[in-house]
Design a protein with these regions (language model features):
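Glycine-rich phosphate/pyrophosphate-binding loop
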Residues: 1, 13-16, 245-249
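Flexible glycine-/small-residue-enriched beta->alpha junction loops
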Residues: 1-7
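Alpha-helical protein-protein interaction elements
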Residues: 8-11, 193
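Glycine-rich phosphate/ribose-binding loops and adjacent secondary-structure elements
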Residues: 11-186
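C-terminal extensions of enzymes
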Residues: 185-253
Length: 253
């Protein structure tokens, strides 16, 4: 892991070392509030596994914002096994998370943010309609900044990979200079040009979300709701509880 000496194990705990349960989490949140002089909101980000239970615990512990990260989320520093075979889909997690906040009386007090595989305004609009208050973007912004750019194909080849499938964030050998501490590689990244591309990407996403909201007759993107959606497959309906197109009721096994 970057500066860790060869032969020295990287400590990666299965649990967060600062808390083991809901009570410890509440204490940690209060510690963070004191450390920041109560000036910033406290976010809790979690993988989407048991959203109905986990979101309730986080909300009751005092979080201002709960971020649910679905299985489609990408990261350059996780094993392929975990990337491909853990977590539940983002869209199915949102509905359960929203219902959890409703059931524990935290809607309006705790914000719900959806993350994981959100690339376009269409993805974001679906998340908002399913109950998310906002969305979080990771890989999409990185790609806009220049991640996986084909400009340095020889460097990708040396890493045994290719543009579009790099997965070397954790090595510090990022060919485009984004995920690295190497001064020479960092020179390849033009932060001003990257920022301009990311700004255009976010602007385009916002325009897409706005257009979809208008198409649904809504004056605000935050007025999008489940009734604006229809599932095009039995699987999508079963995952999300969204009504099936043509029969106007959710699919039930």
């Amino acid at each position: 892991m970057r500066t860790l000496p060869v032969g020295v194990d990287q400590r990666s705990t299965i649990r967060h070392p600062d808390f083991l349960g809901a009570d410890d989490l509440s204490v940690k949140i209060e510690e963070l509030r004191i450390a920041t002089n109560y000036q910033v909101p406290i976010f809790i980000k979690m993988g989407a596994t048991r959203p109905r239970f986990d979101v309730a615990v986080a909300a009751k512990a005092g979080a201002d914002v709960v971020v649910v990260d679905g299985a489609e989320g990408g990261t350059g520093a996780s094993p392929e096994l975990l990337l491909n075979h853990t977590g539940i889909p983002t869209m199915s997690a949102i509905r359960a998370a929203r219902e959890s906040l409703d059931e524990c009386g935290m809607t309006g007090k705790v914000s719900l943010v959806a993350a994981g595989g959100i690339r376009t305004g269409v993805d974001a609009a679906k998340c908002l309609a399913l109950g998310a208050d906002a969305v979080m973007i990771g890989n999409g912004a990185m790609i806009a900044a220049g991640c996986n750019s084909p400009r340095y194909e020889e460097d990708y080849a040396k890493l045994g990979t290719a543009p579009g499938a790099c997965h070397h964030c954790h090595t510090g050998l990022c060919p485009v200079g984004i995920a690295t501490q190497d001064p020479e590689l960092q020179k390849r990244m033009n932060p001003h040009a990257g920022a301009e591309r990311v700004a255009r990407y976010l602007t385009a996403m916002t325009m897409e979300i706005t257009a979809l909201a208008k198409a649904c007759g809504k004056s605000s993107v935050h007025n999008l709701e489940v009734e604006d959606l229809r599932a095009m497959s039995f699987e999508a309906s079963a995952f999300t509880g969204v009504k099936m197109a043509g029969i106007d009721k959710p699919f039930e096994w």
